[in-house]
A protein has these predicted regions:
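Structured segments of extracytoplasmic/periplasmic soluble domains
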Residues: 30, 46, 50-53, 149-156
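Charged, low-complexity, helix/coiled-coil-prone segments
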Residues: 5-14, 71-79, 222-225
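Intrinsically disordered, low-complexity regions enriched in Pro/Ser/Thr/Gly and acidic residues
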Residues: 91-224
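Predominant activation on well-ordered alpha-helical scaffold segments within soluble catalytic domains
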Residues: 41-44, 48, 144
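Short, glycine/small-hydrophobic-rich surface segments
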Residues: 50-90
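N-terminal single-pass transmembrane signal-anchor helix
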Residues: 1-44
Length: 225
């Protein structure tokens, strides 16, 4: 075999190897997305089973949720126990189901309300008859794809396109699921879908492409009654 033939063979091998690496990375990314979507659905069921009978959903505990580890999630206690830890300790979730495998944080859970009718002025907890899950640490493609996959199954979808990176949560507690939706554009953040009169929109690829910044600081908030 001549030197030229050796070079050609090595070039072919290198091209094949590069293709295999790309395919392997895509397969890994696809599995990570599938696992994350599955976990959000599992958590949604656990929340309804646990808090649905009373209709009163827990306050979010951002600092406590971010501080959780695989060991402490089974032992943390007290009045301010993170909702996700409470679900694990009740046997509603496994630790792997409770974790966002992309950001490596446990899912943030908090309460929400629908409108403000009949609420005393200045109240901080307005009904608490609804809830949300926040998924953080998403890049632009992950944020848009998860929104497309699950968004239309939820009453409320909101994008935080900054401050939602791994190790942080951007959503406040006591969300109003009747907040007005925005149209998006240029990687925007904001309410995509809601229970407002004009908020029950169908999330299409075109709509999703107007949200989520070109960074890994996106978080997706999914709310329901």
């Amino acid at each position: 075999m001549t030197l030229l033939e050796i070079i050609i063979v090595l070039g072919i091998i290198g091209t094949i190897a590069a293709g295999v690496v790309v395919l392997a990375q895509r397969a890994y990314d696809s599995k990570a997305m599938t696992d994350l979507v599955t976990n959000t659905n599992t958590i949604r069921t656990a929340i309804k089973e646990t808090y649905g009978p009373t209709g009163i959903y827990p306050n979010e505990q951002v600092a406590g949720t971010l501080a959780l580890t695989d060991a402490t999630i089974n032992t943390v206690a007290g009045a301010n126990i993170p909702p996700i830890a409470q679900l694990v300790q009740l046997g509603k979730l496994s630790t792997s189901e409770a974790k966002n495998n992309i950001s490596s944080n446990y899912f943030n859970i908090g309460n929400a309300h629908v409108g403000t009718a009949g609420v005393a002025a200045g109240a901080t907890a307005i009904g608490d008859r609804a809830y949300f899950i926040e998924v953080n640490g998403l890049d632009q493609k992950q944020c848009r794809n998860i929104m497309l996959q699950v968004g239309n199954q939820w009453d409320y979808v909101e994008v935080h396109n900054t401050a939602g990176s791994s190790g942080a949560y951007a959503s406040g507690d006591h969300l109003n699921l009747q907040a007005a939706a925005v149209t998006g554009g240029n990687g925007a953040g904001g309410v995509v879908r809601s229970l407002a009169d004009t908020g029950n929109v169908l999330i299409t690829p075109g709509l999703a492409n107007g949200f989520c910044s070109d960074s890994a600081a996106n978080s997706l908030v999914l709310g329901s009654r």
